[in-house]
Design a protein with these regions (language model features):
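Short intrinsically disordered terminal tails
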Residues: 1-3, 68-76
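Short N-terminal "domain-start" leader segments
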Residues: 1-35
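A short, exposed loop/beta-hairpin motif centered on an aromatic-Gly-Thr core
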Residues: 6-9, 41-61
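Residue-level marker of intrinsically disordered, low-complexity segments enriched
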Residues: 15-22, 34, 42-45, 57, ...
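Intrinsically disordered and other compositionally biased segments
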Residues: 16, 29, 41, 74-75
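Short amphipathic C-terminal alpha-helix that caps PH/PH-like domains
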Residues: 63-67
Length: 76
């Protein structure tokens, strides 16, 4: 069972968005990780990136860096 909690949102000038979520796994709710969902200006999902061993600050920095054009999206 997974539950998601929106932690923060970061926007590009063109309306694209990076949403940072906390994903809680397991029945006890004690295990979790952070994830970013990237969407284009029309709301179409571009990619999801999971960060299972990173702190919230690290993940939020990654989302902000994408919005600033510092981080590029690469799958794989």
């Amino acid at each position: 069972m997974n539950n998601t909690k929106l932690m923060s949102e970061y926007y590009k000038d063109d309306g694209s968005v990076a949403k940072v979520y906390q994903i809680v796994t397991g029945m006890d709710g004690e295990r979790s990780f952070f994830s970013i969902t990237y969407k284009d200006p029309n709301g179409v999902r571009l990619m999801q990136e999971d960060f299972p061993y990173k702190a919230l600050g690290y993940v939020e920095d990654a989302a902000e860096n994408w919005c600033k054009g510092i981080k590029l999206l690469t799958e794989g």
